[in-house]
């Protein structure tokens, strides 16, 4: 049959048809049914929040930008950080780890390795409370998927928030979230469970990125930290220049600042955050191992600094052992040049998805290339190359992603600024949040941020912090809700209101799960009472959390010891951060000490190690010299201390098993005449069998 339509009308009809189809598609997307609670982020916390919301009888939708559930917990982070305080993990977080324990309690789930030996050595706590904190990624993912299915949660996978216009508001309330695809999800209460805090900008909620200055919250670990990168610092001199010794030749790759001053003054604010990486799941089981291969685009030049560091004497790049069941390991950063990609995350948090994808791809190239460098560069000690050659990617993990984890380790991103800000003072004391919704327990743990060249012309790392909190601490409900004027129906359990320093401890996955369950319970109360999330009664929330077996309080056996501020001490004091030393001296915080830390020599076994304090005295003359140390178990009875006064060395031996006699902190080495203004004290562990401990040296002038 011949058409009677005028051909000139066909383009118009085509346009009308396309418009109609587009409108129809929009209507389909707009037809998503409303939910009581909308959770954005398929992370561990996102799943927990959705499960709790469903158990409370509410309709809930969990929107996951990825196809997978569980975030980092299901993507390689198989060694859970609890700092030894298993008892503070309650509620659904405890249930998660007990489900893991139940899985590994079945002998049929052990295919390689010594199950009984592993359980005694690594997972002995499971016999007491049923929890296992070390697990394979696919097992964690299985638990999350089973949880979601049992709770009949509506899950939307592979939908990413429209970063520009995705948060739809009316006044101070969010009404819906719109995805890149156009799909729109209306709801009553919303929760940001993403690692990036992606709802905060669109919701008009105040937030920050980077490190505050020391002055902002009066935090001693805040801001640029050129002296605090003590845990994974360069221990041997590594030349940073393309042509060794020639600064004019330029910096090697992976070095970011030519001088300390280029980073900013100590304690100043910046927009940088700790490094990201992928937590790799490796195995040494031949039949389950995929060998590490040369990656596409491999460039050994980007690892030249690492090669020079090995040549200088470095010999401990990582610790490979079967820390997870079935002879697998969770490979994390170890040392100043390792799997952490320093400054690789610049631009990630506030970038669009194309930028993020590019940065993620570069992290993969960096880490794959690094492993290949470890295997093949002749400067890497033979025993290390041979050790790594026994390991490879686990064949039964991440099979749909090239056996590579699908979630990059976003250790830190946006942080909300609300009416209550968690700070260093909540973690280290003396402040205590009165409206606890869960406990944190991990030390302040900041991975390195950047590398720089020191005044002597050698490479160092900056930003690394590891400071013990001594005991668990409460986290405030007000820290997970925005200011009322900004948004009345949003809860933020991950990108919560915390300083950079406080977040270093709070950021652990078990805590994320705990806070997310508490957030979902708060959302339930806000729905029941028809009120903003800021107005729920804390007593009512606390009662509900107690019924869910959440742990909200912890009474330590003894008060937290407070560090002694350098500014409070008389005379000239040289702290452990102001020294040069050989090999690794462990940075510690478990006791009373001067400044930010103290050190002990036990790390990679007994070896001759020295710790050298240098002081510039106000003038030559007589000084009393005092030595600070923390009294610990297993200390050395005769630690050799050598004092250089300009008149020859003087060796003094100290019994470190005895409590320090002066203020419980110091022992006097004696009174000495110094011929010049230069004074040196060298601590050694040569010939010792106990642990050598050192903290600070004090020079007190004696009046003539």
Language-model features and meaning:
Residues 15-26:
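Bacterial N-terminal signal peptides
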Residues 115, 141, 175-176, 183-189, ...:
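Flavin (FAD/FMN)-binding glycine-rich loop and adjacent Rossmann-like elements that form
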Residues 58-59, 64-166, 208, 216-218:
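Conserved N-terminal/central alpha/beta ligand/cofactor-binding core
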Residues 28-30:
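Boundary at the C-terminal end of the N-terminal hydrophobic targeting segment
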Residues 1-12:
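N-terminal secretory signal peptides that target proteins for export/translocation
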Residues 46:
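N-terminal Rossmann-fold NAD(P) dinucleotide-binding loop
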Residues 562-704:
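Extracytoplasmic
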């Amino acid at each position: 049959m011949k058409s009677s339509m005028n051909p000139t009308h066909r383009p118009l009809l085509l346009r009308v048809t396309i418009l109609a189809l587009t409108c129809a598609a929009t209507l389909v997307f707009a037809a998503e049914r409303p939910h009581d609670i909308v959770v954005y982020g398929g992370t561990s916390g996102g799943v927990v929040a959705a499960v709790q919301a469903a158990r409370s009888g509410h309709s809930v939708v969990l929107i996951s930008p990825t196809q997978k559930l569980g975030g980092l917990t299901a993507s390689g982070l198989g060694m859970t950080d609890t700092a030894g305080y298993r008892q503070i993990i309650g509620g659904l977080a405890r249930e998660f780890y007990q489900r893991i324990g139940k899985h590994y309690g079945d002998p049929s789930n052990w295919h390689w390795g010594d199950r009984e030996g592993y359980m005694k050595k690594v997972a002995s706590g499971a016999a007491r409370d049923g929890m296992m904190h070390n697990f394979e990624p696919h097992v964690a993912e299985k638990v999350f998927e089973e949880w979601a299915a049992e709770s009949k949660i509506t899950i939307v996978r592979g939908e990413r928030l429209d970063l520009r216009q995705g948060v739809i508001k009316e006044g101070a309330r969010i009404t819906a979230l719109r995805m890149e695809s156009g799909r729109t999800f209306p709801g009553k209460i919303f929760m940001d469970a993403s690692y990036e805090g992606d709802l905060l900008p669109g919701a008009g909620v105040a937030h920050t990125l980077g490190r505050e200055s020391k002055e902002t919250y009066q935090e001693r670990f805040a801001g640029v930290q050129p002296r605090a990168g003590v845990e994974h610092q360069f221990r041997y001199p590594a030349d940073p220049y393309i042509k060794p010794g020639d600064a004019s030749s330029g910096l090697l790759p992976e070095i970011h600042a030519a001088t300390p001053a280029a980073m900013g003054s100590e304690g100043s604010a910046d927009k940088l955050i700790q490094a990201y990486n992928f937590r790799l799941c490796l195995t040494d089981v031949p039949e389950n191992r995929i060998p590490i291969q040369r990656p596409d685009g491999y460039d050994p030049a980007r690892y030249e600094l690492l090669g020079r560091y090995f040549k200088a004497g470095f010999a401990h790049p990582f610790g490979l052992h079967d820390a997870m069941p079935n002879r697998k390991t969770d490979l994390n950063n170890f040392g100043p040049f390792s799997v952490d990609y320093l400054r690789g995350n610049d631009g990630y948090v506030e970038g669009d998805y194309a930028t993020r994808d590019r940065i993620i791809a570069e992290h993969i190239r960096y880490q794959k290339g690094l492993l290949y460098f470890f295997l093949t560069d002749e400067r890497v000690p033979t025993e290390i190359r041979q050790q790594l050659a026994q390991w490879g990617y686990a064949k039964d993990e991440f099979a749909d992603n090239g056996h590579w984890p699908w979630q990059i380790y976003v250790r830190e991103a946006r942080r909300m600024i609300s009416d209550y800000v968690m700070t260093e003072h909540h973690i280290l004391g003396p402040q205590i949040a009165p409206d606890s919704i869960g406990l944190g327990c991990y030390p302040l743990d900041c991975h390195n941020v950047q590398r720089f060249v020191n005044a002597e012309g050698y490479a160092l790392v900056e930003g690394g912090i590891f400071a013990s909190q001594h005991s668990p601490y409460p986290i405030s409900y007000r820290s997970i809700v925005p200011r009322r004027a900004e948004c009345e129906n949003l809860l933020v359990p991950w990108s919560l209101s915390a300083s950079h320093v406080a977040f270093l401890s709070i950021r652990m996955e078990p805590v994320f799960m705990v806070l997310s369950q508490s957030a979902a319970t708060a959302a339930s109360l806000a729905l029941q009472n028809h009120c903003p999330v800021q107005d729920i009664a804390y007593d009512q929330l606390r009662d509900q959390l107690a019924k869910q077996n959440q742990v909200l309080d912890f009474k330590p056996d003894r008060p937290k010891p407070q560090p002694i501020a350098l500014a409070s001490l008389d005379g000239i004091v040289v702290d452990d951060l102001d020294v040069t030393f050989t090999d690794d001296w462990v940075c510690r915080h478990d006791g009373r000490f001067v400044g930010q830390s103290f050190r002990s020599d036990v790390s990679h076994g007994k070896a001759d190690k020295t710790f050298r304090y240098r002081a510039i005295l106000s003038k030559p003359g007589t000084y009393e010299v005092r030595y600070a140390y923390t009294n610990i178990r297993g200390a050395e009875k005769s630690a050799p201390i050598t004092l250089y006064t300009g008149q020859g060395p003087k060796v003094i031996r100290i019994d470190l098993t005895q409590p320090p006699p002066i203020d419980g902190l110091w022992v006097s080495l004696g009174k000495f005449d110094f011929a010049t203004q230069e004074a040196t004290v060298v601590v050694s562990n040569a010939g010792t069998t106990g642990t050598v401990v050192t903290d600070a040296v004090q020079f007190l002038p004696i009046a003539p």
